[in-house]
A protein has these predicted regions:
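N-terminal pre-domain/capping segments
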Residues: 1-115, 135-136, 143-153, 227, ...
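Histidine-acidic metal/acid-base catalytic patches
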Residues: 1-31, 103, 110, 142-143, ...
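Active-site-proximal loop/turn and secondary-structure-junction residues that shape catalytic pockets
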Residues: 3, 43-45, 77-80, 123-127, ...
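Conserved beta-strand positions in the central sheet of alpha/beta enzyme cores
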Residues: 35-40, 73, 114, 118-120, ...
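Short acidic/His/Gly/Ser-rich catalytic and metal-binding motifs that mark active-site loops
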Residues: 73-74, 81-83, 127-130, 200-202, ...
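Surface-exposed cleft-lining segments at the edges of enzyme active sites
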Residues: 87-89, 126-136, 161-168, 210-221, ...
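Active-site groove signature of glycoside hydrolases
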Residues: 105-134, 155-166, 299-300
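Active-site region of glycoside hydrolase catalytic domains
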Residues: 151-156, 189-190
Length: 334
């Protein structure tokens, strides 16, 4: 539900879209009789207050169930007064946001509305600050991630770090792996792969030249693309516990108070570099092309679209159509 909030509501940005409207957009989508099963939630106002009461969580569950939905992954708002790489207070605030998100996630499970999903996190640290001491800052981020991981484990949750080029210690595929390995909690703290963001990993944005996988004179030749995707996903897939279906035109975008990160495109964008139905398989299948069955749901991520685009039913139907194709190609039954 975060596309209704991310990059919106700030000075000079479009108004945010409330949760009820986002749920209604989702509920109205239908392709050949198939509808969305549920939603992932951003635990941030005006959608969901991170300090929501138990009664409020019950009302939230009822609101979602009334539309025939379940909840999957929830996003912990770790950025505003927290950072996994900050001072003691900022790091404590980061862990506090994770604790509160885990509480909400656990309550939703107890209420029977959340059968699967994880808690999404990131380092909440700028790349420029991380660059001043890469080794020391990676160790500090990992230490904070471990503290968050212990909290998650106590709540029966797992944490998934979403790899984006805008977060320190997570801005390249190699740095992301280093951070996860340093954290050292593979059963609790893993990776959230977003098709749009990870595409930029292959191009080496915000990272040393050695982290770029494709050739310098790359022009999207199929063989080079395939080789790069195979190499990246082989390295990150063992850590991957949550997945975002998405499209990207290989550019970056910022909106409102959100830093430049991988640009999400509409599912049908002619400039999109991904074949969504095919390329999801790099993440959902292993090196032998066998379905991994690593996660029980997949989620569409498409942030910073104009509100008029968000208000078109065609937008949601096209997203659902892409999701159905991914499930048909790489899905599994429990």
């Amino acid at each position: 539900m975060w596309p209704g909030l991310v990059g919106k509501g700030g000075e000079g940005a479009e108004a945010s879209i409330d949760l009820d409207k986002m749920l209604d957009y989702t509920a109205k989508a239908e392709v050949n009789g198939v509808k969305f099963d549920g939603v992932d939630l951003f635990l941030y106002n005006p959608h969901v207050d991170i300090d929501i009461t138990d009664d409020g969580i019950k009302k939230l569950a009822e609101k979602i169930q009334s539309r025939g939905f379940v909840v999957g992954t929830v996003v912990a708002p770790v950025w505003f007064d927290g950072s996994a790489m900050g001072d003691a207070t900022q790091r404590a605030n980061w862990v506090s946001a994770v604790r509160k998100a885990c509480r909400i996630g656990q309550k939703l499970r107890d209420l029977g509305v959340r059968p699967y999903g994880v808690v999404r996190i990131d380092s909440a640290a700028p790349v420029t600050a991380w660059n001043k001491d890469p080794k020391g800052n990676t160790k500090l981020i990992a230490k904070t991630f471990r503290e968050g991981g212990k909290v998650a484990k106590d709540h029966g949750e797992r944490l998934a770090a979403e790899g984006e080029i805008c977060w320190g210690g997570m801005q390249s595929w190699k740095y992301m792996i280093q951070t996860l390995e340093e954290t050292g909690m593979p059963k609790v703290v893993g990776f959230q792969a977003d098709m749009a963001h990870t595409l930029l990993y292959t191009l080496g944005y915000n990272a040393p030249t050695a982290h770029r996988i494709v050739p310098q004179n790359y022009h999207w030749e199929p063989e080079a693309f395939h080789k790069a995707m195979k190499k990246m996903t082989a390295a990150l897939r063992p850590w991957t516990i949550d997945f975002h279906v998405a499209q990207n035109d290989a550019t970056v975008k910022a909106s409102g108070d959100h830093e430049k990160t991988g640009k999400h495109c509409l599912a049908t964008d002619p400039n999109g570099k991904l074949n969504i139905a095919r390329d999801a398989g790099y993440w959902m299948r292993d090196d032998a092309s066998k379905v991994t069955k690593k996660f029980q749901h997949i989620c569409w991520d498409g942030c910073m679209f104009p509100n008029d685009v968000m208000g078109k039913q065609e937008t949601w139907n096209n997203i659902l159509s892409a999701m159905i194709q991914v499930r048909e190609n790489h899905g599994w039954r429990a």
